[in-house]
Amino acid sequence: MHRYVVIDAFASEPLQGNPVAVFFDCDDLSGERMQRMAREMNLSESTFVLRPQQDGDARIRIFTPVNELPFAGHPLLGTAIALGAETDKDRLFLETRMGTVPFALERQDGKVVACSMQQPIPTWEHFSRPAELLAALGLKGSTFPIEVYRNGPRHVFVGLESVAALSALHPDHRALCDFPDLAVNCFAGAGRHWRSRMFSPAYGVVEDAATGSAAGPLAIHLARHRQIPYGQQIEILQGVEIGRPSRMYARAEGAGERVSAVEVSGNGAAFAEGRAYL
């Protein structure tokens, strides 16, 4: 049997945020079995905790219902909060296929309620199919250059003129299936406060409640295009349109086209626990 918990990541109470199933002690499971278990859970991601291979506290494998990811934000944040309940450490180092990700844990009355992660610094480039993407989204243009960032997953960013326009968005999900290995992030806002929606049929997710791996790149995108200064933390509210409000906090350090650090943080709340009879 394998014990698991479900953590609602980027939420301060259950039934909000983005849920992730965290399975413990998974060294006996094959990748194929993990994939089938993730499909059975049918959450946007499930994680599997294994013994570390290097100097970390644990090695983490991340699966959507359809594929394995080298890195993802909300699953790792939820996993760090779940593992924090098993230890009195204030810092954790989780090994992923994108390297070891450090976490700082925040406790209240001994309980882990939030954490921050240092994310991999992404690469970025102009997106090669902007007209087709805009057509699939039902948009005529973007308020920012349409660029794609890679920090494991590939995130493309499209800016809208207002939060109202963002909320009214009804993309053609069948057309979005023509963009393999891509998460489509639409955003609007100003200053420290931003709203986001993410669509990714390619990753088995119609619409995501909270996309932690996109939060850092969005902070970089805004800083590169001089909408915020480097070093300023932004709040990203996501999941409102699907009834799962999620709050992510992101900050990028750097200057111009050089990024030196990316930090993403948020709360997490335990929703359920159980055992898989495998």
UniProtKB/Swiss-Prot annotation:
Catalytic activity as recorded in UniProt: (5S,6S)-6-amino-5-hydroxycyclohexa-1,3-diene-1-carboxyate = (1R,6S)-6-amino-5-oxocyclohex-2-ene-1-carboxylate
Record carries keyword Isomerase: yes
Catalytic activity, EC: 5.3.3.17
GO cellular-component term (any): cytoplasm
InterPro entries the UniProt entry points to: Phenazine_PhzF-like
GO biological process per UniProt: phenazine biosynthetic process
Listed GO MF terms: isomerase activity; trans-2,3-dihydro-3-hydroxy-anthranilate isomerase activity
Keywords for this protein: Antibiotic biosynthesis, Isomerase
Active site location: E45
Function: Isomerase that catalyzes the condensation of two molecules of trans-2,3-dihydro-3-hydroxyanthranilic acid (DHHA) into the phenazine ring system. The final product is not yet known.
PANTHER family linked: ANTISENSE-ENHANCING SEQUENCE 1, PHENAZINE BIOSYNTHESIS PROTEIN
Name under which the protein is recorded: Trans-2,3-dihydro-3-hydroxyanthranilate isomerase
Organism: Pseudomonas aeruginosa (strain ATCC 15692 / DSM 22644 / CIP 104116 / JCM 14847 / LMG 12228 / 1C / PRS 101 / PAO1)
Lineage: Bacteria, Pseudomonadati, Pseudomonadota, Gammaproteobacteria, Pseudomonadales
